[in-house]
């Protein structure tokens, strides 16, 4: 049982390492054009987030875990709103205060 658990964590470590290294090599060797590169990085990021939620936070879609999953999703949405709002404010400040 204990050995099986360690093998699972080792597999997840290798999987997440590959998902981290793939975008770096895609940038260095210019495998994709710029738009496809952004999409590739976002897809790798999405799969990393799902793997962390599933395997390290041990969350799933069962009824017992539903409220924990909802709280994680809510936290991600609030963080995304704060991030995008900050980018929007800084971009508008740059456009409005730019000296021509």
UniProtKB/Swiss-Prot annotation:
It is a multi-pass membrane protein. One of its GO terms (cellular component) is plasma membrane. It is found in: Cell membrane. Residues 33-36, 91-100 are extracellular. GO terms for molecular function: cytochrome bo3 ubiquinol oxidase activity; proton transmembrane transporter activity. It holds the Pfam family COX4_pro. It comes from the Bacteria. Heterooctamer of two A chains, two B chains, two C chains and two D chains. This is Cytochrome bo(3) ubiquinol oxidase subunit 4. It comes from Buchnera aphidicola subsp. Baizongia pistaciae (strain Bp).
């Amino acid at each position: 049982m204990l050995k099986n658990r360690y093998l699972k964590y080792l597999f997840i470590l290798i999987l997440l390492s590959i998902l981290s290294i793939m975008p770096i090599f895609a940038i260095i060797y210019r495998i994709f054009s710029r738009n496809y590169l952004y999409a590739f990085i976002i897809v790798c990021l999405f799969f990393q987030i799902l793997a962390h939620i599933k395997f390290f936070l041990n969350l799933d879609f069962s009824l017992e875990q539903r409220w924990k999953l909802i709280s994680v999703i809510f936290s991600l949405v609030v963080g995304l709103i704060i991030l995008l709002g900050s980018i929007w404010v800084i971009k508008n400040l740059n456009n409005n205060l730019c000296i021509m």
